[in-house]
């Protein structure tokens, strides 16, 4: 908890810096994944939910909070921010876990106590109704200077072997 708390304080400081130095009172989107999702929930509650920032937050895409699931209950402590249930809704949370249907939820030796909220990004509903692939308008594929072909050329990952590191603090 201390480590996650320390990491959250860093996220909060970075968000404050962004708002004060770069945002210029413009709308913004919160986007997180995995551990970042766990930090985004308290950020929404502490910094955005009851402040003027809420009106500027277009949406919060909190993706992949598998170990500590994002649920309606985890959002219920907020006064003005809730789960998206309509494609035209603003100032809401969209969440889904990034795992295949039928995959085990027993991750890292931790069994999740409740099911996650799931906002289907094709229907914008939080029910379990399947939406067929025909409803997907497609994807935007990078072209030109935006197509870096990451991992396919000189930047392809290779195995690395590291020597043991000394203790960070010497007594």
Predicted regions: what is each one?
Residues 10-25, 45-171:
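Surface cap/lid and interfacial helix-loop subdomains adjacent to catalytic sites
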